[in-house]
Amino acid sequence: MGRNSQGFLTTIRIIVTSATDQPSNFIHSLSNKRESTMRQIAFYGKGGIGKSTTSQNTIAALAETNRIMIVGCDPKADSTRLMLHTKAQTTILHLAAERGTVEDIELEEVLLEGYQGVKCVESGGPEPGVGCAGRGIITAINFLEEEGAYEDLDFVSYDVLGDVVCGGFAMPIREGKAQEIYIVTSGEMMAMYAANNIARGILKYAHTGGVRLGGLICNSRNVNCEAELIEELARRLGTQMIHFVPRSKQVQEAELRRMTVIEYSPDHPQAQEYRELSRKIENNTNLVIPTPITMEELEELLVDFGILGGEDEYEKALQADKAATKA
């Protein structure tokens, strides 16, 4: 073998040695970042169920190891307040209304950096009784895409009102923006009713947009047999209860300070619950097309678990009311 060949082998040895001198976790980290693709998830749920609180605490935990942007898609504009420690963020729709067009908005005016470097945006909504709140979502997402806000991210999280899945609120589902939907619910009838309706919306667009249901998150209201009830609802919807979040006063303590539990009390057991939920979402591969149930099936489920009374109990209650009225 000639000198040139020996020099070539020496060069190879230097390159290999340089690579192996790096810590294995450094190489693994670089490899993961190269191979990773941005995941777009969405949290849907009935108004008042604790959707925004649950999503922000989960994202705060997820942000410990990932680059994330939150896009608030609720007219209340409360999807980012715990990340930013503020009452409400200026919304895209509000600025667009002030200036007459979204084209006069600068990205820095509506995209703020919060806890753990999470990027925060609120789509906003119109004045009560005027226009469609869902249009704010469409305007916001189009604006963010055009301005390059989706670059260099591991996750985008949409926080969406879910009492009704109308055209505007279904936009992240319909247009395939969010590929994974997580429904925040509880053992209360209306929360479960909303969850089933959201599952219907996912089913409608699953074959055209590729959206899938990632699971139900039970944000506990201390209803009897709540975990078992939501597990059964999840089974009937063809999905999983991905996590049961216990009720804790620590959540309210943190909210009073406009903080997530992850930031306010990172070592508290409730913070560990959100970390566990974030870990399950990060590793989740159980993404399904849901199988919504009928209203009759939902009521039967609630009767079986003692949340609703059966027909006999209903009639007895009516008779008792009549007797009390006569007396």
Curated annotation (Swiss-Prot):
Essential cofactor(s): [4Fe-4S] cluster
Annotated SUPFAM superfamilies: P-loop containing nucleoside triphosphate hydrolases
Molecular function (Gene Ontology), one example: metal ion binding
Residues covered by region (PEST-like): 1-37
GO biological process: nitrogen fixation
Binding site for ATP: 45-52
Function: The key enzymatic reactions in nitrogen fixation are catalyzed by the nitrogenase complex, which has 2 components: the iron protein and the molybdenum-iron protein.
Name of the protein: Nitrogenase iron protein
Record gene name: nifH
